[in-house]
């Protein structure tokens, strides 16, 4: 005590002195310190370019005064670089100093921050403090981005898929830069609209604006556009959009031509508005029965040619070629006759065609690229087989009549009718050709070739106009047409063309004006004048209508048809009046074409004339008559009228001198008097007079007669023109001569047309009779022609005449000399003498008078040869030497010419090749004259001895230089019989198996000869020595097989040793074969074979070497003597090593798994290969997976198959992905390893598409790998690296809700994984990728689907469709409201949780503080402990209640019972106040309860008049002390218990058993004769809750028995101890209590029930309603019994019946319901502490039957800390019954730690302990071992009920047996402790809790000893058998409670303070 006092005194003194020192210095230490909190540095921010004087810091807040009369601090700036900062020390302000400069954060200044130190000097104490000020310069967006280049350029192929990045030129430093910082300096790229190139921004896009990578947005087409100008805008990312700065550049994108178009046949005529060519058909015609040599190549019109439409593919070397072929054709046997060259498209005839069998061939030709492009072009080829030309052409009509409008333009087609509706069709056929085929005739016009022409193709020909025609000039054209087929001509056919009139002429009056006189006596209707206008047109165009326009004044009218002007009706002429009439003459053409003219008629009115002459009706008469008209025909009736009625006499006054016409004098009838001849006179103008006999009574009329022609004359040739003509050959269109014929007929009858009667193909004649050559004539073919010229008139029935002309063809020098052979080849032997003639050449010239001469054209050979100029003889100028020519074939090729000396044509040329024949100049020459060799005497046949060699000097490659060998068997016959030489190699070998004598020498003559002419040879001698057998080494074995050699063996590694022996010979070893690659070497001396080169098992697995051993003498002689003995074979096997690691087929595997996949679903299969063999190629796969939640491994892999499967469920994990590695290790997992990455993405049907095809699922499943590769390719066109994964293959589902299945079709469900995002590609995107390429995919699928197989559609899965339908049924408004509500709820839930948790924590802390304060205030003062006195008869009266007596309700019944026991134990010698210190250690919160019970009545009611609190109370298990109501308080219940409440307890105990009565008597001693009983319900039905007492009561045994009897009478369901009895409580309803209320009531109920049971009887059976468990007897009980449950069995709430017999172990076996509702009534022994056997799980806890604890031999060590607790299960009241026995099914779990030395603990969470639990966790429990049966013990059979929340007690047993049982159980049972929860409430603040628990455990042991010692006598009296079991030896009663409590107090003396 003194030491403590001293320490406390020293500590207090130090504290006081330090405080005084601090107070003294505090006022000065604060100066220079910051008056603010927070970080020591001052950080401010300022914008760049801020103005000078900007305040940086308005107050530094440094303590102290820097100005004034008495400053305490001094401020200054340090480290002020460039003096950017100024300071006002008085105001402690900092300013920006930017005088003459600008604060710029950007380059080149790069001022990002300014750091200065404010130095503060404390003037009082002299200390210096530096305060750092950091000025951060904020960036302003004052700089615009700048591009590194003015423009950028990119090229992209037109075949580039959409989505491809085509330009990355802005990456790095190549793009735009902005020297601003942060967002102001970050660049975004966007594409702007380019008005000059509007499509550029639609074609390209920048999806990632920060990178600027340009991506193709639309497909390109080189044929549409080849260049784009894309405007790229770069802008910074300033937060204010209005402040962003931009700049632009232009990216020029050139589109490269790609191979996207196929070939195209030429000529191509495009279909309008498309790029497609019209169908093209090529034409060809071949005559029948012609040989291929005559026709090949066949001429096709137009020539077959195809070009690639992609004409600008770069580089040109990549441009594909065109391949031509005949695809199909009819007839089917066309391949017999035709072949098309694949490169040139040249059509060839294979064999003659007979037209009787084949009239035509229709072929389809194909042009395709030679690179396999899938777009070929097709065209037709029509081949006509022509008949043999033995028939002349003919016309289908004898003549043709055509019509043409005279106004028709040039090129108009002649019509066949007057209405001009259809053209004139001229059909010419050839009998050699079918009528339906074009005979390809040439049609010629014999006349008017300058006016008309005829089309030259087709069966039907048409005449067209070459120049305008005029009907008025020539009304008809008549000519003939002749058809010519190349050999024969047709008969000419006459064509008559009539020119139809057009209104091209205007009516014309003869005079412009007329003067006429009229008389006053003329009457209306009298004629004034008849006007006549003339119009040369015909028909209505020539019909004239007359009209008076003006001037008539209504007095005159005109006849519209005749033009006769008469006096109008009712008009009288007035003398002197004059009229000027304007008369119009107009034709009757359509109004738009009508023509007219006018004239003026002047009329004067005169007085009347009474003697007027006769008058004709008209003054002019016109008529036409044919010259063939008969004589006497009436032509005209001329009738004149005389006003006076006088007779009139008619006469022809003029115009008919020949008297051709007759005129009747009286009648005026004009008739024909003579025959007409139009050729002599074609017009007559007759003047006819009419006279009445008076002199002035004569008038005249004019008759105009035109004589029309008839064809009565044939054309007549001019006899004076020459008929012998000549023409020069080789001139086309050369003038030959002219003929002329005349026809006196008029019109067409007199028009003469010329034509040729023959040779129309060679000559032509014009319309004027000029004859020209139609083609070039060749005199050499024909030099004379008789040409027939035909002259025909143009009548309908024409007349014609002929003329024969003699035409001679004149020769010109138009042919060159032609050699008889174009090539001459001559073989000349070398060394022929000069002047030898070696060749005669000849040439001919077909021209007349030609003189041919010869000469050598090649000057380089003129020194070898001479050519005679006239004879053509070729001779040598010198001899030729074959060896002088460098080529293998010595030849000279040159040109010779033949020319006409007097001609002008170029010379003829021929090629002469002179081949020099080698004449074998040199013989072979041996390299040696004598060769030596050695041979073994027993050498076998074929043993090589030596090799001879000869060389020939003749040029190599010629027969003269080929050297061969043979043996000369003439000189040495015997050696020649046993030896031979190989003909080509010269190797001398044995011919037979030798058996010769050693040392024999043979001579062999070898001859070398060549194959030249003549054959030349030479010889050499070979000396062969037969060796002695002893001189030939001999191998010890014929074959050597060394151990296998590792392929990793290094160079020099020994393989094996070979050994040979010889007599007195040094042996040399060598490898003679099998070592071509020099892989092995051999030591020539030792015979060690070693590795000389790299080995590779994978390349070669074994070698066979042939080794030879020779003597050194033989080797030095450069010889070898092979024999049977000195050669051997070495077989070397190569051993494979693990030198190649496994290699995966892919470096990156992509797979997917559906989120509803089951466990161990296959995901994908990986495969690795290894070049090694055997075990080294056997893989073992394993996965390296990063940690997954809850320690699960998501995937597993089959070790030897590589099949990856799922190892977990993936519910609700869509869009998750897993990345891990798969390792393949060869040699079954012990060798080298390779790895690959695996990506598995979790998907569901929202990511999938269904590909529906019309093939069965079985077929798709067989081809699924190939089909998946095709789908991969198309998806990867859009997303590189993407992988298509097949989810399922099944029958097609269709119909409503997809309920029908069609197994003839297939549903292929797929999805795709994007390796960039590691997730599934959006379902809609996948649909676009596949549906857009559906046609191409079908083409690729065709080889696998078969004929007709294809994809029908791509649709969404049925699950997605149903979701869509449900989603569509929800309106947009409702959906939006729901979404809004959902968002609000999500936002509110966290806030509510935060509030609840905060409030909960606040209430917990508040309750703990309140409880702690109350406990500390209520604890009495402690007194020293004294030994316990002997028991007394009755307890002394209790003292007055302390101030804390109201804690009774707050601490609860369990605390009261516990403290009451300690109160009674200590009343003998020590008062409660004296034991306060010890009780404070044992249970600090129980002192108030003890004092409260000191003032209690004997019946248990409190003497305090204070109202008992109904406030909420707290157990240690509670997390919220305000969460439960005090169950001991009930309103309107008396303070003192009455007997009326006894009936409420009769349901729970059975005190009438003998054991219970005996026990109750023994327990009623002098100290206490009353038992206290509390009852509390846990989750009871409402019916039973009324019977549960709410207040603590004290009743005696008789009251209890009476209450029980009453309950029995009411049949309240007391359960007997018989197993299997029914319990009425099982049918009751369950009360609605919260879990916490259930737990709290259960805790109280268990404590009360256990006390009552123990007070009634410790050896009787007692049964309560309880959960359904299986029970059996426990083995010998140790301190703890492990209770371990199966995974499906909750081991917390359990009860077991313990019999003290080894045959019934107590185990747990139950499945529990939601709630626990046990009802427990236990008698409570007031004289005994039964609480040491209790543990208190928080929610549910099974109990085991504990035994009384033995006294501890030594203080126990601290028990292990509890592990975390499991959540409690629920217990249903319907699972309760009295426990039947059953064998244990599971090991017992380890109970939680308890403070009692001996207990049967429970598993599961503990209930609140009476003392604090251990705060530290338990170590891992040892493995559980089943408990074997213990040794037999004579225990009394006692049944105990284990009730939830408590531990059952049982009868005491002898200490020896207890000890033995403990020992046995501890050695045979390994107990496992279930985790406990951490301490709650005030126990969390208890320090040294482990030591405290240890001390309390010792204290309980001492208390138990004292109790047993005082009650053993009574127990022996009342229950001897029990007393025997309850004896305890005196050795166990060691130790003192006071000592234990004192030691505990020293260890935790400050616990109350801490609390």
UniProtKB/Swiss-Prot annotation:
Glycosylation positions in this chain: 52, 97, 201, 419, 559, 662, 724, 768, 821, 851, 1064, 1084, 1175
Cytoplasmic topological segments: 1398-1955
GO cellular component term, pick one: stereocilium
InterPro entries on file: Cadherin-domain_protein (IPR050971), Cadherin-like_dom (IPR002126), Cadherin-like_sf (IPR015919), Cadherin_CS (IPR020894), EC_dom (IPR041149), EC_dom_sf (IPR030718), PCDH15_12th_dom (IPR056989)
Signal peptide: 1-26
Transmembrane portions of the chain: 1377-1397
Outcome, altering residue 1342 to K: In USH1F; benign
Keywords: Calcium, Cell adhesion, Cell membrane, Deafness, Disease variant, Disulfide bond, Glycoprotein, Hearing, Membrane, Non-syndromic deafness, Repeat, Retinitis pigmentosa, Secreted, Signal, Transmembrane, Transmembrane helix, Usher syndrome
SUPFAM superfamilies: Cadherin-like (SSF49313)
SMART domains attached to this UniProt entry: CA (SM00112)
Ranges facing Extracellular side: 27-1376
Positions of disulphide bridges: 32-120
Function: Calcium-dependent cell-adhesion protein. Essential for maintenance of normal retinal and cochlear function.
Entry comment, domain topic: Cadherin repeats 1 and 2 mediate calcium-dependent heterophilic interaction with CDH23. Three calcium ions are usually bound at the interface of each cadherin domain and rigidify the connections, imparting a strong curvature to the full-length ectodomain.
Protein name per its UniProtKB record: Protocadherin-15
Gene name linked to the record: PCDH15
């Amino acid at each position: 005590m003194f030491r403590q006092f001293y320490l406390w005194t020293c500590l207090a003194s130090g504290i006081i002195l330090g405080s005084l020192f601090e107070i003294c210095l505090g006022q000065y230490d604060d100066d220079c310190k910051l008056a603010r909190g927070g970080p020591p540095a001052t950080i401010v921010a300022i914008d760049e370019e801020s103005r000078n004087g900007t305040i940086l810091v308005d107050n530094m807040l440094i303590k102290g005064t820097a100005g004034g009369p008495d400053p305490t601090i001094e401020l200054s700036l340090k480290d002020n670089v460039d003096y950017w900062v100024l300071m006002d020390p008085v105001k402690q302000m900092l300013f920006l100093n930017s005088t003459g400069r600008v604060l710029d954060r950007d380059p080149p200044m790069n001022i990002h921050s300014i750091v200065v130190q404010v130095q503060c000097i404390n003037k009082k104490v002299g200390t210096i403090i530096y305060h750092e000020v950091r000025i951060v310069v904020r960036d302003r967006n004052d700089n615009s981005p700048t591009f590194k280049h003015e423009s950028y350029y990119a090229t992209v192929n037109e075949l580039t898929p959409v989505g491809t990045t085509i330009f990355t030129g802005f990456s790095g430093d190549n793009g735009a830069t902005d020297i601003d910082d942060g967002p102001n300096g970050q660049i975004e790229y966007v594409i702007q609209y380019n008005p000059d190139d509007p499509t550029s921004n639609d074609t390209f896009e920048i999806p990632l604006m920060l990178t600027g990578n340009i991506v193709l947005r639309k497909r390109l087409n080189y044929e549409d556009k080849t260049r784009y100008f894309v405007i790229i805008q770069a802008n910074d990312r300033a937060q204010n959009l209005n402040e962003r700065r931009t700049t632009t550049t232009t990216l020029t994108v050139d589109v490269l031509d790609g191979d996207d178009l196929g070939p195209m046949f030429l000529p191509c005529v495009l279909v309008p508005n498309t790029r497609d060519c019209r169908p093209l058909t090529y034409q060809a015609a071949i005559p029948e029965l012609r040989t291929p040599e005559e026709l090949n190549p066949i001429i096709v019109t137009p020539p077959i040619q195809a070009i690639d439409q992609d004409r600008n593919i770069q580089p040109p070397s990549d441009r594909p070629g065109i391949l031509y072929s005949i695809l199909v054709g009819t007839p089917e046997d066309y391949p017999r006759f035709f072949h098309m060259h694949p490169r040139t498209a040249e059509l060839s005839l294979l064999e003659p065609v007979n037209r009787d069998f084949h009239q035509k061939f229709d072929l389809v030709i194909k042009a395709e690229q030679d690179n396999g492009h899938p777009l070929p072009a097709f065209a037709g080829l029509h081949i006509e087989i022509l008949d043999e030309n033995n028939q002349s052409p003919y016309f289908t009509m004898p003549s043709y009549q055509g019509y043409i409008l005279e106004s028709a333009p040039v090129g108009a087609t002649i019509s066949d009718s007057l209405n001009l509706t259809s053209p004139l069709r001229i059909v010419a056929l050839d009998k050699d050709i079918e009528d339906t085929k074009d005979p390809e005739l040439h049609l010629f016009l014999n006349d008017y070739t300058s006016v008309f022409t005829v089309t030259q193709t087709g069966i039907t020909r048409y005449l067209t106009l070459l120049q305008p025609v005029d009907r008025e000039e020539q009304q008809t054209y008549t000519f003939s047409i002749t058809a010519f087929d190349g050999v024969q001509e047709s008969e000419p056919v006459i064509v008559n063309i009539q020119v139809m009139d057009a209104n091209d002429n205007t009516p014309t009056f003869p005079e412009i004006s007329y003067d006429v006189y009229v008389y006053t006596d003329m009457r209306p209707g009298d004629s004034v004048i008849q006007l006549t206008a003339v119009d040369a047109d015909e028909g209505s165009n020539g019909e004239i209508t007359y009209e008076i326009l003006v001037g008539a004044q209504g007095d005159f009218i005109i006849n519209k048809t005749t033009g006769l002007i008469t006096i109008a009706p009712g008009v009288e002429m007035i003398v002197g009046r004059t009229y000027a009439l304007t008369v119009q003459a107009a034709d009757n053409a359509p109004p738009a074409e009508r023509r007219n003219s006018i004239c003026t008629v002047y009329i004067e009115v005169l007085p009347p004339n009474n003697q007027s002459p006769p008058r004709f009706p008209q003054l002019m008469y016109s008529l036409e008559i044919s010259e063939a008209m008969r004589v006497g025909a009436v032509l005209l009736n001329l009738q004149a009228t005389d006003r006076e009625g006088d007779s009139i006499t008619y006469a022809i006054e003029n115009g008919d001198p020949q008297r051709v016409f007759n005129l009747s004098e009286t009648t005026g009838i004009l008739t024909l008097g003579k025959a007409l001849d139009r050729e002599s006179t074609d017009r007559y103008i007759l003047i006819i007079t009419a006279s009445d006999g008076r002199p002035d009574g004569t008038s005249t009329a004019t008759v105009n007669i035109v004589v029309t022609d008839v064809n009565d004359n044939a054309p007549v040739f001019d006899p004076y023109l020459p008929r012998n003509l000549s023409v020069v050959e080789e001139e086309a269109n050369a003038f030959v001569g002219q003929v002329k014929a005349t026809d006196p007929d008029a019109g067409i009858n007199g028009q003469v047309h010329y034509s040729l009667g023959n040779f129309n193909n060679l000559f032509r004649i014009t319309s004027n009779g000029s004859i020209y050559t139609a083609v070039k004539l060749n005199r050499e073919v024909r030099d004379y022609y008789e040409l027939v010229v035909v002259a025909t008139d143009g009548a309908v029935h024409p007349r014609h005449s002929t003329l024969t002309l003699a035409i001679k063809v004149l020769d010109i020098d138009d042919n060159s000399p032609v050699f008889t052979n174009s090539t001459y080849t001559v073989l000349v032997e070398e060394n022929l003498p000069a002047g030898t003639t070696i060749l005669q050449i000849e040439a001919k010239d077909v021209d007349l008078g030609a003189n041919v001469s010869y000469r050598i054209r090649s000057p380089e050979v003129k020194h070898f040869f001479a050519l005679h100029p006239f004879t053509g003889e070729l001779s040598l100028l010198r001899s030729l030497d074959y060896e002088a020519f460098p080529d293998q074939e010595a030849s000279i090729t040159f040109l010779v010419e033949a020319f006409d000396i007097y001609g002008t044509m170029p010379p003829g040329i021929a090629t002469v090749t002179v081949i020099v024949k080698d004449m074998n100049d040199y013989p072979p020459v041996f390299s040696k004259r004598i060769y030596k060799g050695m041979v073994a005497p027993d050498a076998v046949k074929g043993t090589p001895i030596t090799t001879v060699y000869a060389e020939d000097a003749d040029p190599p490659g010629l027969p003269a230089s080929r050297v061969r060998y043979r043996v000369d068997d003439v000189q040495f016959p015997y050696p020649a019989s046993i030896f031979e030489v190989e003909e080509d190699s010269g190797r001398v070998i044995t011919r037979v198996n030798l058996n010769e004598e050693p040392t024999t020498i043979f001579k062999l003559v070898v001859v070398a000869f060549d194959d030249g002419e003549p054959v030349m040879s030479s010889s050499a001698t070979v000396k062969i020595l037969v060796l002695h057998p002893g001189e030939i080494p001999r191998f010890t074995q014929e074959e050597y097989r060394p151990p296998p050699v590792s392929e990793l063996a290094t160079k020099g590694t020994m393989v094996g040793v070979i050994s040979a022996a010889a007599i007195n010979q040094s042996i040399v070893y060598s490898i003679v074969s099998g070592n071509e690659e020099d892989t092995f070497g051999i030591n020539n001396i030792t015979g060690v074979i070693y590795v000389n080169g790299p080995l590779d098992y994978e390349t070669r697995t074994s070698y066979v070497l042939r080794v030879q051993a020779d003597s050194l003498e033989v080797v030095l002689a450069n010889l070898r003597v092979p024999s049977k003995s000195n050669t051997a074979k070495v077989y070397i096997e190569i051993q494979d090593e693990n030198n190649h690691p496994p290699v995966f087929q892919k470096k990156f595997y992509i797979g997917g798994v559906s989120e509803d996949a089951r466990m161990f679903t296959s995901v994908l299969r990986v495969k690795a290969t290894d070049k090694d063999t055997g075990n080294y190629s056997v893989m073992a796969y394993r996965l390296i997976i990063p940690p997954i939640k809850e320690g699960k491994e998501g995937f597993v892999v089959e070790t030897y198959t590589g099949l990856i499967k799922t190892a977990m469920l993936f519910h609700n994990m869509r869009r998750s992905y897993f990345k891990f590695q798969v390792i393949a290790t060869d040699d079954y997992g012990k060798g080298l390893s390779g790895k690959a990455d695996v990506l598995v993405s979790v998907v569901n049907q929202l990511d999938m598409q269904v590909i529906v095809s019309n093939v069965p699922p079985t077929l798709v499943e067989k081809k699924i790998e190939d089909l998946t590769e095709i789908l991969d390719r198309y998806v990867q066109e859009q997303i590189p690296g993407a992988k298509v994964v097949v989810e399922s293959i099944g029958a097609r589902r269709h119909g409503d809700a997809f309920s029908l299945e069609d197994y003839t079709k297939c549903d292929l469900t797929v999805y795709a994984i994007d390796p960039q995002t590691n997730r599934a590609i959006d379902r809609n995107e996948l649909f676009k990728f596949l549906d857009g390429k559906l046609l191409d995919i079908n083409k690729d699928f065709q080889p696998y689907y078969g004929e007709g197989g294809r994809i029908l559609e791509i649709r969404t899965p049925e699950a997605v469709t149903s979701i869509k339908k449900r989603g569509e049924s929800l309106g947009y408004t409702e959906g939006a409201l729901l979404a809004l509500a959902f968002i609000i709820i999500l936002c509110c839930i966290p806030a509510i949780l935060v509030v609840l948790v905060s409030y909960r924590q606040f209430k917990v802390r508040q309750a703990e503080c309140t409880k702690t304060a109350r406990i500390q205030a209520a604890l009495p003062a402690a007194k020293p402990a004294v030994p316990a006195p002997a028991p007394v008869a009755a307890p002394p009266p209790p003292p007055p209640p302390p101030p804390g007596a109201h804690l009774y309700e707050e601490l609860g019944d369990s605390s009261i019972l516990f403290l009451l026991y300690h109160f009674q134990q200590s009343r003998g010698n020590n008062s409660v106040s004296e034991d306060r210190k010890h009780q404070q250690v044992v249970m600090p919160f129980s002192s108030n309860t003890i004092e409260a019970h000191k003032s209690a009545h004997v019946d248990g009611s409190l003497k305090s008049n204070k109202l008992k609190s109904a406030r909420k109370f707290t157990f240690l298990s509670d997390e919220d002390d305000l969460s439960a109501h005090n169950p001991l308080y009930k309103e309107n219940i008396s303070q003192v218990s009455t007997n009326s409440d006894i009936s409420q307890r009769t349901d729970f105990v059975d005190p009438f058993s003998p054991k219970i009565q005996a026990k109750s008597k023994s327990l009623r001693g002098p100290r206490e004769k009353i038992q206290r009983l509390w009852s509390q319900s846990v989750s009871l039905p409402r019916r039973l809750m009324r019977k549960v007492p709410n207040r603590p009561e004290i009743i005696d045994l008789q009251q209890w028995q009476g209450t029980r009897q009453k309950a029995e009478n009411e049949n309240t369901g007391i359960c007997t101890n018989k197993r299997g009895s029914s319990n009425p409580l099982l049918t009751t309803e369950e009360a609605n209590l919260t879990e916490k209320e259930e737990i709290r009531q259960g805790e109280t109920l268990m404590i009360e029930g256990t006390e009552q049971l123990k007070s009634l009887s410790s050896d009787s059976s007692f049964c309560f309603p309880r959960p359904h468990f299986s029970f059996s007897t426990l083995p010998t009980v140790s301190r703890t019994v492990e209770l371990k449950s199966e995974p499906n069995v909750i081991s917390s709430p359990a009860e077991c019946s313990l019999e003290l017999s080894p045959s019934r172990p107590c185990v747990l076996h139950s499945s529990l319901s939601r709630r626990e509702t046990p009802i427990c009534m236990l008698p409570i022994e007031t004289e005994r502490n039964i609480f040491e056997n209790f543990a208190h799980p928080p929610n549910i806890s099974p109990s085991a039957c504990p035994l009384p604890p033995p006294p501890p031999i030594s203080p126990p060590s601290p028990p292990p800390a509890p592990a975390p607790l499991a959540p409690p299960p629920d217990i249903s009241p319907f699972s309760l019954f009295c426990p039947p026995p059953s064998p244990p099914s599971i090991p017992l779990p380890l109970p939680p730690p308890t403070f009692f030395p001996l207990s049967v603990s429970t598993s599961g969470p503990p209930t609140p302990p009476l003392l604090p639990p251990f705060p530290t966790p338990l170590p891992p429990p040892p493995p559980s071992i089943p408990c074997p049966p213990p040794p037999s013990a004579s225990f009394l059979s006692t049944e105990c009920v284990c009730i939830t929340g408590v531990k059952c007690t049982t009868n005491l047993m002898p200490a020896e047996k207890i000890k033995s049982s403990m020992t046995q159980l501890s050695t045979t049972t390994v107990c496992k402790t279930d985790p406990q929860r951490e301490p709650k409430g005030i126990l969390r603040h208890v320090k040294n809790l482990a030591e405290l628990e240890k001390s309390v455990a010792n204290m309980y042991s001492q208390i138990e000893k004292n109790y047993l010692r005082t009650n053993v006598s009574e127990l022996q009296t009342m229950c001897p058998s029990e007393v025997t079991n309850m004896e305890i030896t005196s050795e166990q009663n060691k130790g003192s409670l006071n000592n234990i409590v004192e030691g505990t107090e020293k260890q935790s003396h400050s616990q109350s303070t801490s609390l």
